[in-house]
Amino acid sequence: MDWAEKYRPRHLNEMVGNREALHQMSEWATRWTVESPPLILYGKPGIGKTSSAWALAHDMNWEVVELNASDQRTKAVIEKVAGGSASTGSLTGAARKLIILDEADNLQGNADRGGARAIAEVIRQARQPLILIANDLYGLDGTIRNLCTKVQFKALPAKSLVPRLREICSREQLTCSAQALTDIAEQSGGDIRSAVTMLYASAIGKDTVGEDDVSISAKDSRASIFDLVAATLGYRQVPSLLDMSMSVDETPDTILQWIEGNLGVLPDRKKTAQAYAALSRADMYLGYTFLTQYYTLWRYATSVMLYGVHDVMKGRPSGYAKIMPPSRWRQMSVAKKQKTIREQLLSDMGTSMHMSASTVRNLYLCPISLLAKQFPEQFAKSYDLDVDKLDILIHDPATSKSIIKKIEDEKKQIEKELKKKKKEEDAKGKKARGSKKEKEPIVEETPSIDSFSSQEPGNPPEQPSTEPVEKDKKSSQSTLFSF
């Protein structure tokens, strides 16, 4: 059995590091109510996010329903699995049911179409604890981030990994040198899962593990696009920008857009022009690549863009700048989201008005918007609009938020009153049944057949009159031919 799974922590007090995050999770679980927002656990892979969620469920005696990247996560699947689980109780007798959505930032392509929207809807309607797990916090939809409490998991320092590795060696009766454990901890990059896997790979078929036995190459150390852009702009020193670009899981055209989107830090126009000249030349190579399908040109494009911009940045005072995704992407994302919301709104209104969405768009959208501005609350209630859909009609985000919040508060208040009324009715019914039971007269038991059979043959008991009974029997057994 793989040691990473064999020695997975079962309780929060067995977790290594991230004490602040674990304390935050424990406090959230202890004080959880239906109104509590879900948690987002985010950080590098392998630092204990999923294990801590399972350990929390074990400590709280909660049942677990998990949906990860290996499952299909379309809107229908999420609403069926997570949505149904989040709104119903446990069938196993557990106190509650914890919904874990692992790799929530990996909803991509047609396979996970509509998943992000479904997650947001599940969060709003959840009646059970919900935890989302992500490697990249900003890979999640903004709506989901705003609905959740964020808990950051940080990479573990090497010195905190060594005691855990030593404990595993002791349980496996394995002799391992201190230097070998230190090497494994340092090479893991704060990834405890990788460290345990490296120890397991080094110990296969051995009773003793030394420095020469350690499989240092077991961890694939990859750079992120943020590291590459920071190195290109001169914020960090690396041996080779080209080698670093090979370890980044992005294509050259994407790297070019990242660099271009962060050129606002350049000090003067002359240097800005020089940097854009390098990017322009690289873009020409990319164009030739797609035109000829000769992908060897990618290497030239990458070299020109990286070293061209890096050379311009020489002599600039070193410091720190926040590396951001290209602003164009954010604008495109907002436009795409607005278009999706608009099309959904038109479709819903067309269905309620018995006409097509295109007819609503071409003929009725303007008068509908005018009416919605005059009666926004009535429109929101009639068509069950959320903040985004109402904002499409009235073009006032602040008013839309206040109106939807007011409607949601009214719904919650009505729901509380109904629950309170139901509890009072149940209590009155229980009290009435109890008083009725006390007032019922004690009915003497009718002698049974066994009591007659227990009498002696010589002394037959005095039998009550059975004439009415016989009459009742005859009347109940009467047929069409009875006279």
From Swiss-Prot:
Residues 448-457 have a biased composition (Polar residues). Residues 417-442 have a biased composition (Basic and acidic residues). ATP binds at residues 43-50. Keywords: ATP-binding, DNA replication, Nucleotide-binding. InterPro entries: AAA+_ATPase (IPR003593), ATPase_AAA_core (IPR003959), P-loop_NTPase (IPR027417), Rep_factor-C_lsu (IPR023935), RFC_lid (IPR047854). GO terms for molecular function: ATP binding; ATP hydrolysis activity; DNA clamp loader activity. GO terms for biological process: DNA replication. Belongs to the activator 1 small subunits family. RfcL subfamily. Heteromultimer composed of small subunits (RfcS) and large subunits (RfcL). Part of the RFC clamp loader complex which loads the PCNA sliding clamp onto DNA. HAMAP family: RfcL (MF_01508). This is Replication factor C large subunit. It comes from Methanospirillum hungatei JF-1 (strain ATCC 27890 / DSM 864 / NBRC 100397 / JF-1). The lineage of its organism: Archaea, Methanobacteriati, Methanobacteriota, Stenosarchaea group, Methanomicrobia.
